[in-house]
Regions:
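Extracytoplasmic
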Residues: 184-192
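Active-site-adjacent loops and short helices of periplasmic peptidoglycan-processing enzymes
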Residues: 23-183
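Sec-dependent N-terminal signal peptides of Gram-positive bacterial secreted proteins and lipoproteins
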Residues: 2-23
Length: 192
């Protein structure tokens, strides 16, 4: 009986160990039939091995658009992660003028002039509905009342984490001169 159990256990062990290898080969075959990537650029990294598994135009500068909010989020969390509920900010009126100067159909979180919100709510407003006004409120606070100061902080942080082709000009991505690459976007998201 012991011999039978040992043989059965060995067989089960071999099957269990062989399944991942079989699945690995199968997924490689499936990738040949995957739909073509239509994005202008992509950069995929295996986070366990730090090996680039897919690269398409990863160094080509493109408009950062709302990915800009990821850098605003990174700076917010680096400085205030433990104070997200204890600090509340009031929306300054001038930020709405900045937003509407750039776009009349900008995405917002419907934060009104003069309303007060916690940093946590502003973070959610930036990330979920892509609220441009939330990014500007955070930038105003962190930049000491100056959006330009905050944008300088964004560009300094981008350089510090290894971004080589990224330039920010506003905290939310409305301005088309916010530029990044797929590789630099990966570095920003990895830092988060």
């Amino acid at each position: 009986m012991k011999k039978f159990c040992a043989i059965l256990f060995s067989f089960v062990l071999i099957v269990v160990l062989a399944l991942p290898a079989a699945a690995e080969g199968e997924s490689a075959a499936l990738s040949d039939t995957a739909p073509a990537l239509t994005a202008p650029a992509a950069y995929v990294v295996n986070l366990d091995t730090n090996i680039v598994v897919y690269d398409k135009n990863s160094e080509v500068p493109l408009s950062a658009a709302s990915l800009t909010k990821m850098m605003t989020t990174l700076l917010l969390l680096e400085s205030y992660q433990d104070q997200l509920d204890s600090i509340s900010l009031t929306a300054p009126s001038y930020i709405y003028d900045l937003i509407w100067e750039q776009s009349t159909n900008a995405s917002t979180a419907d934060i009104r002039r003069g309303e007060t919100h916690s940093l946590r709510n502003l973070l959610y407003a930036m990330l979920l509905p892509s609220g441009n006004e939330a990014a500007y409120i955070v930038a105003d606070y962190m930049g000491g009342g100056s959006i330009d100061n905050f944008v300088a902080m964004m560009n300094n942080e981008a350089a510090a984490i290894g971004c080589t082709s990224t330039t920010f000009v506003d905290p939310c991505g409305l301005n088309p001169n916010n530029i990044t690459t797929a590789r630099d976007a990966y570095l920003i998201l990895r830092a988060l």
